[in-house]
């Protein structure tokens, strides 16, 4: 709960990433329940940011932004499902689900969330072809349901080696936001906190 938008120091080095993540978090207030259908969603404001791909060197606040989205949505709309996972944990859970014959449970968990937040997606790099296809199909299922996918990486989508071209295209289809090292002014603010 320490990760919020209020305590994220932002400036020129990370403003686009901050504003995009914040818009996606605020979009949770636009979800509506409709009596005709059990659960219809309307997200006009932040849909241009979906999927959101935040990239930059380690230690600059990418994970903070993911957790800020998660905390905001969980606080303001506890009825919505938010899932934060590292790429390593996602891959380990996928492998375990394959081994134990529980792929249906895995798919239900990941493909039906309103907000899927995956940290350090570049670590999917060494996964097997079948795992990468599962990742691609998971992303498609979420996108087809107009739900949010937010990922972080230390490199651009086009620099993700050994990734399916279709997955790179999916990452690139929304907002790509770069976080660069902070300037002197931002460093000063961070040090004062």
Question: How would you name each of these model-derived features?
Answer:
Residues 1-18:
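Dynamic helix-loop-helix/coil hinge segments at AAA+ ATPase domain boundaries and subdomain interfaces
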Residues 39-66:
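Walker A/P-loop nucleotide-binding motif
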Residues 95-99, 157-173:
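Short regulatory helix/loop adjacent to the ATP-binding pocket of P-loop NTPases
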């Amino acid at each position: 709960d320490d990760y919020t938008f209020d305590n994220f120091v932002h400036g020129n080095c990370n403003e686009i990433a901050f504003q995009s993540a914040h818009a996606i978090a605020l979009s949770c207030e636009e979800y509506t329940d409709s009596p005709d259908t059990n659960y219809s969603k309307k997200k006009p404001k932040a849909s241009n940011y979906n999927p959101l791909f935040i990239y930059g060197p380690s230690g600059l606040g990418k994970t903070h932004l993911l957790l800020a989205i998660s905390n905001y949505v969980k606080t303001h709309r506890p009825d919505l499902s938010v899932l934060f996972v590292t790429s390593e944990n996602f891959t380990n859970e996928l492998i375990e689900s394959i081994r134990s014959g529980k792929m249906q449970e895995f798919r239900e968990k990941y493909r039906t969330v309103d907000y899927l937040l995956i940290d350090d997606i570049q670590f999917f790099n060494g996964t097997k072809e079948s795992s990468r296809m599962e990742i691609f199909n998971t992303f498609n299922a979420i996108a087809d349901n107009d739900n949010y996918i937010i990922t972080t990486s230390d490199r651009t989508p086009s620099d993700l080696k050994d990734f399916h071209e279709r997955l790179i295209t999916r990452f690139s289809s929304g907002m790509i936001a770069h976080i660069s090292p902070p300037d002197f002014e931002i460093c000063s603010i961070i040090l004062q906190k």
